[in-house]
């Protein structure tokens, strides 16, 4: 059992995973995760019913398994991204960099490919230029071989005569482009719709989720995870009975409503340390719908509702078979600057709570063809070194970084890199003109900071927020403070000698 990743998320045992699924080549019963020690999900009573264990697979022949060719995935990537501002001031949330060389959109995309699902739609709306560019370069420009699959970007659109404007929620986004999907489904024999978020960090075999959905003959299946009290109010919380059927759903409850959603999570003691610390089961925002059920909910039964979590799902419980799939691996919702910062910092730890590298289920991203990193007389502890870095006589700890000059020190920081290089001659010319080159200058000390792309930080700068300011807006000076973390804006310049 692993150590707790945070007080809000349960420490979970990482399962062993099979290679990318090719449905036609499957032989025998599906291998369970946790190395065969237990089921990858549990169906158990978390209301008044006694807990019981239900294995995911019962050793049926491969002919009874779900076909990934009958599944289409839709990634919701069109939110305003206000909670990740200023990182989302010029980009959509799924385009935000993570882990040194990836984008958040790479997480659900890679999970789909590794699950054998190759019919993927990405819905976009706000600040979508960089997201569209990344998707094209990575998944449409010859980088990934889809065989008979496809990736299609569905931009927000308005039909003639519509009173409303842009997408007003997750369900409304679906409703406005459903005519495109209906035309697609007619020709592709799609039976199940997988709905995903573009702002989470996790590794999941989606076909295990789909298989449970089929085995239970569910109309809707929610993927859920145990969470602690500190962040429970940020999520939609669920209760389900001994058969796994969801009996209550509450979106971001507070006060007494939050207390009422507590459950007995002792049935998860096979996977987490001290389940009592994680008394809530949260919806991950990952859903599987029967195709016809989804179309009926959006076009007829709940045609006036805009959001899945807060409006449609609580109502659908009463007249549909809504099942829960409890996910017991690492999962982090990247919904705020604090959670984004903590998730990136955790990637630097040894061993990390989440590992991007897995030869059987790799994460894909756009190739950048950068040269190897060069370093000289540096002291580095628990850090992620980006491609093509230049490091000179610097000290780095718990940091993801790029270009640093002599005497600089970074601790608990994240640098997102730059779009282009500046040569030594260009840097010398800029400094002779009193300007600041890209990267971190000499003798600069930085801690608890996120440095967005193409930032120019001068010499003898100190960024530490010693006064402990929690929130501040200083766009004219090139930075914001969110949850006590200093965020240097994209393309910002911090002049020599500045103290933040």
Swiss-Prot record:
<keyword id="KW-0548">Nucleotidyltransferase</keyword>
<comment type="pathway">
    <text>Glycan biosynthesis; starch biosynthesis.</text>
</comment>
<dbReference type="GO" id="GO:0005524">
    <property type="term" value="F:ATP binding"/>
</dbReference>
<dbReference type="GO" id="GO:0019252">
    <property type="term" value="P:starch biosynthetic process"/>
</dbReference>
<dbReference type="InterPro" id="IPR029044">
    <property type="entry name" value="Nucleotide-diphossugar_trans"/>
</dbReference>
<dbReference type="InterPro" id="IPR011831">
    <property type="entry name" value="ADP-Glc_PPase"/>
</dbReference>
<keyword id="KW-0808">Transferase</keyword>
<feature type="transit peptide" description="Chloroplast">
    <location>
        <begin position="1"/>
        <end position="33"/>
    </location>
</feature>
<keyword id="KW-0750">Starch biosynthesis</keyword>
<keyword id="KW-0021">Allosteric enzyme</keyword>
<dbReference type="GO" id="GO:0009507">
    <property type="term" value="C:chloroplast"/>
</dbReference>
<comment type="similarity">
    <text>Belongs to the bacterial/plant glucose-1-phosphate adenylyltransferase family.</text>
</comment>
<dbReference type="InterPro" id="IPR011004">
    <property type="entry name" value="Trimer_LpxA-like_sf"/>
</dbReference>
<comment type="subunit">
    <text>Heterotetramer.</text>
</comment>
<keyword id="KW-0067">ATP-binding</keyword>
<comment type="function">
    <text>This protein plays a role in synthesis of starch. It catalyzes the synthesis of the activated glycosyl donor, ADP-glucose from Glc-1-P and ATP.</text>
</comment>
<dbReference type="GO" id="GO:0008878">
    <property type="term" value="F:glucose-1-phosphate adenylyltransferase activity"/>
</dbReference>
<keyword id="KW-0934">Plastid</keyword>
<dbReference type="InterPro" id="IPR005835">
    <property type="entry name" value="NTP_transferase_dom"/>
</dbReference>
<feature type="region of interest" description="Disordered">
    <location>
        <begin position="1"/>
        <end position="47"/>
    </location>
</feature>
<keyword id="KW-0809">Transit peptide</keyword>
<dbReference type="GO" id="GO:0005978">
    <property type="term" value="P:glycogen biosynthetic process"/>
</dbReference>
<dbReference type="GO" id="GO:0009501">
    <property type="term" value="C:amyloplast"/>
</dbReference>
<keyword id="KW-0035">Amyloplast</keyword>
<dbReference type="Pfam" id="PF00483">
    <property type="entry name" value="NTP_transferase"/>
</dbReference>
<dbReference type="InterPro" id="IPR005836">
    <property type="entry name" value="ADP_Glu_pyroP_CS"/>
</dbReference>
<protein>
    <recommendedName>
        <fullName>Glucose-1-phosphate adenylyltransferase large subunit, chloroplastic/amyloplastic</fullName>
        <ecNumber>2.7.7.27</ecNumber>
    </recommendedName>
</protein>
<keyword id="KW-0547">Nucleotide-binding</keyword>
<keyword id="KW-0150">Chloroplast</keyword>
<dbReference type="Pfam" id="PF25247">
    <property type="entry name" value="LbH_GLGC"/>
</dbReference>
